[in-house]
Amino acid sequence: MSEYLLEMRNIGKEFNGVKALDGIYLKVRAGECVGLCGENGAGKSTLMKVLSGVYPHGTWTGEIFWEGKELKASGIRDTEAAGIVIIHQELMMVPHLSVAENIFLGCEPTTGGFIDYDQMNARAAELLARLKINDINVALPVYHYSGGKQQLIEIAKAINKNAKLLILDEPTSALTASETRVLIDLIKDFKKQGMACVYISHKLDEVAEISDTVTVIRDGAHIATRPMSELTTPDIITMMVGREMKNLFPREPHDIGEVMFEARNISCWDVTNPGRKVVDDVSFALRRGEILGIAGLVGAGRTELVSSLFGVWPGACQGQVFLEGKEIKIRTPRDAVRQGICMVPEDRKRDGILPIMPVGHNMTISVLDRFSLRGLIDKDAELVAIQREILRLKVKTADPMLAIASLSGGNQQKAVLSKMMLPDPKVLILDEPTRGVDVGAKYEIYKLIFALARQGVSILMVSSEMPEVLGISDRVLVIGEGKLRGDFPNENLTQEKVLAAAIGKPATNAA
């Protein structure tokens, strides 16, 4: 019997002659968690698609051995039958089906040729209880539950398929801290029961906590496989990016000028519960060249606030907005962009990109009028602008006419940033600008933010990552339960002080 549950040997994969994977090795023992690390575009997702059967045997080179025998999977059914189950970053839930129906999708229990819903609900409830998940009603539609709960339902679905190896691709990117803790504890329990895990995450603190071994790949090549006990987070970062990064936040001096943007008494109401305020009488000012961070707990009202300022909050709103001292009316994103206010949204996949359109068109769609004459687009002029943006933001793409969905998350995010920078905004709103982005791409995005501030652009940034807020902001607003809880200059500001304000201590205005 082989020492390893899984061995991937010398795996190679090409797309149109371009090598996406070149000689990758990955080994996993039963009961072991292997952290798979690499920048966006390094080849992690491609490697997992090879392993999970998305790319069938024959479309790639190398060998896969499972439980000591060569595995030649022709599709996902083969790998799942063997016990290899992948949970993608984008959850594969059917929102209007019940929890039980999602767990048993494709393998529903039947009696007399008909689905036995009583048996299905009972088995689903039993499965969740076995996983110590006691606050989910299996009869309710999945859309009733948060992203964190849906992630747990996906895991229950995998366990129902008798998974021996669980592949988790960025499982906590949209989870709260408490939901993340539940997930990590669950994975630790699985390890004790002998289940293996491949854990892909840009959150290296999570990788360090649950991984026994770390494999790093860069530009499609295997860089190293080492025990986590021999590594530090800076070691992993150095292997990922190919250089030492002493300071993740490349702060650069920039002048802060007069007030550019002001919001007065902004209130917004819940779409589903119109009597409930999600933003409650918030006022603040933003200066020219200033980076203003917005911190707070998940659900505090941060996204609702900035969405209202960009004209995309679907519920009722009231208040006043001033730009360069003059009151402006923003009812739609078109109004905002015309006034010089642009926004990078929180959910890139849903709100930021047109997935089947080319990378280049996703960049220029905000300024097509620049390349239009009598209703016709000057393709040559547009292509020049696209190529300039690709170079400026270091977007990795073989061809700007490829569908943007084919790019890694970090490169998609750079394209979204480009789309919102091309209109030359006076105010740029960034809602979770580095969510799902690797450490190298984060560094490049931070440099870009500082460069924009030096040019006089006013930056309003929402982030759930406290080190990010404190690392790049000149000033920090704290929102809690829809209210402004604090306004702090970022001088000796600590995470503890921000969190204390977020959970309801009296607001402090020190700006």
UniProtKB/Swiss-Prot annotation:
Its main location: membrane. NCBIfam families: PRK13549.1, xylG. One of its GO terms (molecular function) is ATP hydrolysis activity. The keyword Ligase does not apply. Part of the ABC transporter complex XylFGH involved in xylose import. Responsible for energy coupling to the transport system. SMART domains: AAA. The complex is composed of two ATP-binding proteins (XylG), two transmembrane proteins (XylH) and a solute-binding protein (XylF). Signal peptide: none annotated. One of its GO terms (cellular component) is plasma membrane. It catalyses: D-xylose(out) + ATP + H2O = D-xylose(in) + ADP + phosphate + H(+). This is Xylose import ATP-binding protein XylG. The lineage of its organism: Bacteria, Pseudomonadati, Pseudomonadota, Alphaproteobacteria, Hyphomicrobiales. Residues 6-244, 261-506 form the ABC transporter domain. Belongs to the ABC transporter superfamily. Xylose importer (TC 3.A.1.2.4) family. It comes from Brucella abortus (strain 2308). Its EC number is 7.5.2.10. It is a peripheral membrane protein. It is found in: Cell inner membrane. Keywords: ATP-binding, Cell inner membrane, Cell membrane, Membrane, Nucleotide-binding, Repeat, Sugar transport, Translocase, Transport. InterPro entries: AAA+_ATPase, ABC_carbohydrate_import_ATPase, ABC_transporter-like_ATP-bd, ABC_transporter-like_CS, ABC_transptr_XylG, P-loop_NTPase. ATP binds at G38, E39, N40, G41, A42, G43, K44, S45.
